[in-house]
Amino acid sequence: MRSKYIVIEGLEGAGKTTARNVVVETLEQLGIRDMVFTREPGGTQLAEKLRSLVLDIKSVGDEVITDKAEVLMFYAARVQLVETVIKPALANGTWVIGDRHDLSTQAYQGGGRGIDQHMLATLRDAVLGDFRPDLTLYLDVTPEVGLKRARARGELDRIEQESFDFFNRTRARYLELAAQDKSIHTIDATQPLEAVMGAIRTTVTNWVKELDA
């Protein structure tokens, strides 16, 4: 079986770290053990510096990061990660498990920020070409649930401090995009933890078995 790229998506507090652990455990039970893990923005020295710039509320002092500057920094970090880490890993037969990818930009910047969706799609295609994840698990939570969990973790980053309206628009765009793409599987992450973990296991197991069919 050829290596695959699996991405975990969702609002802050959706449970992406727990989901990643369940995905890894499930893949290992299916005999897949050669894996690497990525996060966006980040995952390379350059991309981590861009992550600090775009997420650390103190990174540029009093200067306001404009919406377009923000999205371009996300794409700069993304293409560096894809070209130097993800594609080489896949070419070497290693599975890649990612914490966020382009769907985040389409939802957060296209939905939350209200940036023109055609422009974002054009930018995505120019930067990434036809490169896409093989499977995306979208963990769906309401902003109320997600931000409550995020706040319990500690200090919020620049984007986590956005309004409920911002996150409601982001979630709506996530759901809209998920409904349009069969490679995106929506998991109700407001369920009890065991139910969420079970849904992830079932989704990943069935998907891998279909690859073998």
From Swiss-Prot:
Entries under PROSITE patterns matching the protein: THYMIDYLATE_KINASE
Record's protein name: Thymidylate kinase
Molecular function, one GO term: ATP binding
CDD domains: TMPK (cd01672)
Family under the similarity heading: Belongs to the thymidylate kinase family.
Ubl conjugation is among the record's keywords: no
Keyword vocabulary terms for this entry: ATP-binding, Kinase, Nucleotide biosynthesis, Nucleotide-binding, Transferase
Organism: Escherichia coli O81 (strain ED1a)
